[in-house]
Design a protein with these regions (language model features):
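Long, compositionally biased
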Residues: 88-89, 113-142
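Recognition helix of helix-turn-helix/homeodomain-like DNA-binding domains
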Residues: 61-77, 102-104
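The alpha-helix within a helix-turn-helix
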Residues: 46, 57, 86
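Short, basic-rich loop-to-helix N-cap that marks the start of a DNA-contacting helix
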Residues: 74-87
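Short, charged recognition helix plus adjacent turn
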Residues: 1-13, 97-125
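A short, Lys/Arg-rich alpha-helix, primarily the initiator
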Residues: 18-52, 129-143
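Key DNA-contact positions within bacterial/archaeal DNA-binding proteins
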Residues: 54, 65, 94
């Protein structure tokens, strides 16, 4: 199923000037947040689908059973576990922020030293091991 990107929707919205057009736009099925949970959002991402569960488990160093419990929604992952999965999947900062929000965890904070390092690791498309090495290099706790 094709999902409109936010940018595409913003471009359409920029040209709407009447209430009738606005109402038609809001009725459009793509103008909803179809993701109310972390697992549904995470599994919908192209990079996650491309890698597959086995590779994500390997790259994130999560226990296989824990990973599947997260994806089934029977376990709620902590912030570091979500970050491990996002790094393993090579998600963008925007995708990672959304994943953190949907999982009920705090987004990366630009005034927090550890979060700054993690943001740079995400921007560099670093894996979990490289992110942990970067954290350790600057005296911060590695991802749990």
């Amino acid at each position: 199923m094709y999902e409109s990107t936010t940018t595409q929707l913003e471009n359409i919205l920029a040209n709407i000037s009447s209430e009738k057009q606005m109402e038609e736009f809001m009725e459009h099925p793509k103008v909803t947040d179809s993701f109310h949970s972390f697992p549904k959002y995470f599994e919908s991402l192209e990079s996650v689908q491309t890698l597959g569960s086995g590779e994500l488990i390997k790259r994130s160093s999560l226990e296989r059973s824990y990973y599947y419990q997260i994806m089934k929604g029977t376990r709620s992952p902590g912030r570091d576990k979500v970050l491990r999965l996002c790094l393993a999947a090579g998600l963008t900062l925007r995708e990672t922020t959304r994943a953190l929000e949907l999982s009920g965890n705090a987004p990366l904070y630009p005034k927090n030293r550890r979060d700054i390092i993690l943001t740079v690791a995400i921007n560099q498309k670093a894996g979990v091991i490289d992110a942990n090495l970067l954290l350790s290099k600057y005296g911060e706790e590695p991802l749990a």
